[in-house]
């Protein structure tokens, strides 16, 4: 009985010690892991770029619709929102399945290439005398599809980069990265568009 009691006390003390250690984790503990740090920085830059592109597309579509006169500018902006939302909903189940079964690093690479193609086409098109609205919508749809696959792949990769006890911290840092990018992206886009137009935003 004494041995069992001692074992139980030891187990409790070990659990308490572990919890205490966990409670003293640095707010940036997950960033000590190189692979997660690279993923986190990539997410910060990628999300900021996405937010910048959203602002640039909205400005470009509004100006094109206003100049062309074939469609009301407010309606044109509403259709942009639809072009972003429909692919996200349509691919929701498929993107989750692919993220679970595919090589997540390869999937992130492919989605990055897709996003680059979308931005490059928009940047090149913005230099045309008349940019077709349909082309802008097509690239918005491509970017939305890419984003639908990128998000679950990135989330599924996180648990493989840090120990289980660090995972809550890693997820919290991901939220912080998203919030920072959501604030900084539109601000930078607005400043850059006011200074040099929409094309430079697409190239960033």
Predicted segment positions?
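Alpha-helical transmembrane-bundle signature of multi-pass membrane transport and export proteins
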Residues: 5-204
């Amino acid at each position: 009985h004494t041995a069992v009691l001692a074992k139980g006390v030891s187990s409790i003390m070990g659990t308490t010690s572990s919890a205490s250690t966990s409670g003293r984790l640095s707010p940036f503990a997950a960033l000590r892991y190189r692979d997660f740090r690279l993923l986190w920085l990539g997410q910060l830059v990628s999300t900021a770029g996405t937010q910048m592109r959203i602002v640039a597309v909205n400005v470009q579509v509004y100006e094109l619709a206003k100049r062309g006169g074939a469609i009301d500018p407010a309606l044109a902006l509403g259709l942009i929102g639809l072009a972003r939302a429909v692919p996200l909903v349509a691919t929701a189940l498929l993107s989750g399945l692919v993220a679970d079964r595919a090589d997540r690093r390869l999937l992130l690479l492919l989605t990055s290439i897709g996003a680059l193609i979308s931005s490059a086409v928009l940047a090149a098109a913005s230099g045309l005398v008349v940019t077709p609205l349909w082309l802008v919508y097509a690239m918005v749809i491509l970017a939305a599809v890419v984003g639908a696959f990128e998000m679950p792949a990135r989330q599924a990769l996180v648990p493989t980069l840090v120990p289980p006890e660090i995972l809550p911290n890693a997820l919290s840092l991901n939220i912080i990265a998203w919030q920072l990018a959501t604030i900084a992206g539109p601000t930078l886009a607005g400043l850059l568009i006011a200074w040099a137009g929409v094309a430079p935003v697409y190239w960033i």
